[in-house]
Amino acid sequence: MILEKIKEKKREEIRQLLLTANVAHMKKKILELPPARDFRKALYNQGQVSLIAEIKKASPSKGLLCPNFDHRQLAHIYQSNGAAALSVLTDENFFLGKLTYLEEIKQQSSLPLLRKDFILDPVQLYQSRLAGADAVLLIAGLLTPGELSQLFLLCREIGMQALVEVHTQEELQRVLTTDAKLIGINNRDLSTFQTNLATTAKLLEQVQIEDITIVSESGIAQKEDIKFLKSLGVHGVLVGEALVTAQDIAKKVQEIVVAGGRGEA
């Protein structure tokens, strides 16, 4: 299963990182950083669906998505055409991402940045904050309840927000017992990589939406998808593949932003 391969490779990465990382020094450096940008606030526009536009070069299921990939240019196009926040894939082995993409985008963009990776260990959170992440993705399906709680609380402690991702009812119920206020519903089953927007509709039935900011992730490609998700009360959408594979990326961003309600009369 691809997910098990990803976890195994990520744990090896973490082992290598821990051999060289000075965690005490990392913690000290974090105390010197300015406050992170408010990722959740950037998404919340009453009655609208905000776009988290993703910097995505490749995927395990489809390979290289964007042959002429330029992370800085993508970030500029996304921001100048109405994205509310940016997601930066930093996994190298399966998504051809780099942590340096996040660091470099932080220097040029004023939008909140989400580090999208497979976070399994506290050292990755320290690394993320120092690289410029304002929020990180925590995938409930990859973590035990204890691990999720530990990482979630550490995010808060070091001034980052966590977008906590769920795909099943069981995962959602587990996350709802935490203090998570930013929940991502992944329409992609990570064991099969199949997508279905009905996943968001199904899981939303269990959420008191007034208290929680909901992001729908994966399988979102057309303005009709945005309008459907808007009708459910979703606050944000995370879109990557549909943007980086578009013939006219700026136009595609505008299409999604307008469908979400921003730019409409």
Curated annotation (Swiss-Prot):
It is an enzyme of class 4 (lyase). InterPro entries: Aldolase_TIM (IPR013785), Indole-3-glycerol_P_synth (IPR045186), Indole-3-glycerol_P_synth_dom (IPR013798), Indole-3-GlycerolPSynthase_CS (IPR001468), RibuloseP-bd_barrel (IPR011060). Gene3D superfamilies: Aldolase class I (3.20.20.70). The keyword Lipid metabolism does not apply. Pathway: Amino-acid biosynthesis; L-tryptophan biosynthesis; L-tryptophan from chorismate: step 4/5. GO terms for biological process: L-tryptophan biosynthetic process. It catalyses: 1-(2-carboxyphenylamino)-1-deoxy-D-ribulose 5-phosphate + H(+) = (1S,2R)-1-C-(indol-3-yl)glycerol 3-phosphate + CO2 + H2O. Keywords: Amino-acid biosynthesis, Aromatic amino acid biosynthesis, Decarboxylase, Lyase, Tryptophan biosynthesis. Its EC number is 4.1.1.48. One of its GO terms (molecular function) is indole-3-glycerol-phosphate synthase activity. CDD domains: IGPS. Belongs to the TrpC family. NCBIfam families: PRK00278.2-4. This is Indole-3-glycerol phosphate synthase. It comes from Desulforamulus reducens (strain ATCC BAA-1160 / DSM 100696 / MI-1).
